[in-house]
């Protein structure tokens, strides 16, 4: 694998796909509460700056082919490696490489974590655990504001806005799906097959080319079938919306 990498080198397309993917990955990771908390906590813990993501993305976005080759030649080429083989019981002959390294533990001294100084403090309850808690008030769910619109071609649209992260999610549903073929035995599986085919080649792109174009901008366009519809799903960064919609049009039409 490393020999083929050296022979092939790093292409502009490789760099474009990496940049698009890594930026999308970090930004999309901030959409959920868990994603925000985990990233803020990790950066605060290891760098002292909870907003380290800004600097991190800046470093990734400016990476070059020369940077990749420099790191490869400095840290990987000709360096020691570790092989880990997970084998079925009784088939040890499948091991990737012989076990030729032994850890020298003669000079090892276990660190003192201070466990022997800890004292167990038993929790004290302020309620009776033998009694089932009573019902509290029903929670009030605050539904985000949304809007509806009917386009000139009678297509109905529903949307909502959120300014937390610069992303756009689009779902286009066409009536159909498994329910419409339920009473037509000669068409069973047609909805699923149609959705699978729509994820393959288009008029101007092979499936591989379409995937590569989406990776360059960190977007996704997929087609799936459900009980009552065929659904086109789009996920993209706001700045790449126009390019992504062009690829959606290519896939749909």
Regions from the PLM with identified roles:
Residues 68, 74-83:
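Extended, domain-scale alpha-helical bundle/helix-rich regions
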Residues 1-29, 187, 200-206, 234-253:
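M16/insulysin-pitrilysin zinc metalloprotease superfamily fold
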Residues 1-4, 36-37, 49-51, 63-66, ...:
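Extended non-catalytic domains of envelope/secretory-pathway proteins
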Residues 84-213, 217-220, 225, 231-236, ...:
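His/Glu-rich zincin catalytic helix
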Residues 27-60, 92, 244:
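Scaffold signal of the M16-like zinc-metallopeptidase fold and its non-catalytic homologs
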Residues 2-29, 34-40, 80-92, 211-216:
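Acidic/histidine-enriched alpha-helical segments
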Residues 55-58, 69-74, 145-147, 157-159:
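Generic recognition of flexible, low-complexity loop/linker segments
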Residues 22, 68, 154:
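Hydrophobic, well-ordered secondary-structure elements that form the walls
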């Amino acid at each position: 694998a490393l020999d083929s990498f050296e022979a092939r080198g790093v292409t502009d397309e490789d760099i474009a796909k990496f940049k698009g993917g890594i930026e999308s990955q970090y930004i999309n990771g901030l959409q959920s509460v868990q994603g925000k908390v985990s990233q803020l906590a990790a950066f605060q813990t290891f760098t002292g700056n909870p907003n380290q993501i800004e600097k991190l993305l800046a470093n990734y976005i400016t990476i070059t082919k020369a940077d990749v080759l420099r790191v490869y030649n400095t840290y990987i080429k000709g360096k020691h490696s570790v092989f880990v083989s997970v084998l079925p019981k009784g088939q040890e002959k499948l091991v990737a490489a012989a076990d030729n390294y032994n850890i020298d533990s003669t000079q090892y001294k276990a660190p003192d974590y201070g466990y022997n100084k800890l004292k167990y403090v038993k929790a004290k309850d302020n309620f009776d655990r033998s009694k089932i808690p009573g019902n509290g008030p029903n929670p009030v769910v605050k539904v985000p504001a949304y809007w509806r619109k009917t386009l000139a071609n009678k297509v109905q649209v529903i949307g909502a806005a959120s300014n937390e992260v610069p992303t756009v999610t689009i779902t286009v549903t066409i009536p159909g799906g498994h329910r419409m073929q339920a009473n037509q035995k000669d068409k069973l599986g047609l909805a699923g097959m149609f959705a699978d085919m729509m994820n393959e080649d288009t008029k101007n792109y092979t499936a591989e080319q379409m995937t590569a174009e989406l990776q360059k901008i960190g977007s996704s366009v997929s087609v799936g079938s459900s009980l009552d519809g065929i659904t086109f799903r789009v996920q993209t960064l706001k700045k790449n919306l126009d390019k992504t919609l062009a690829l959606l049009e290519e896939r749909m039409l």
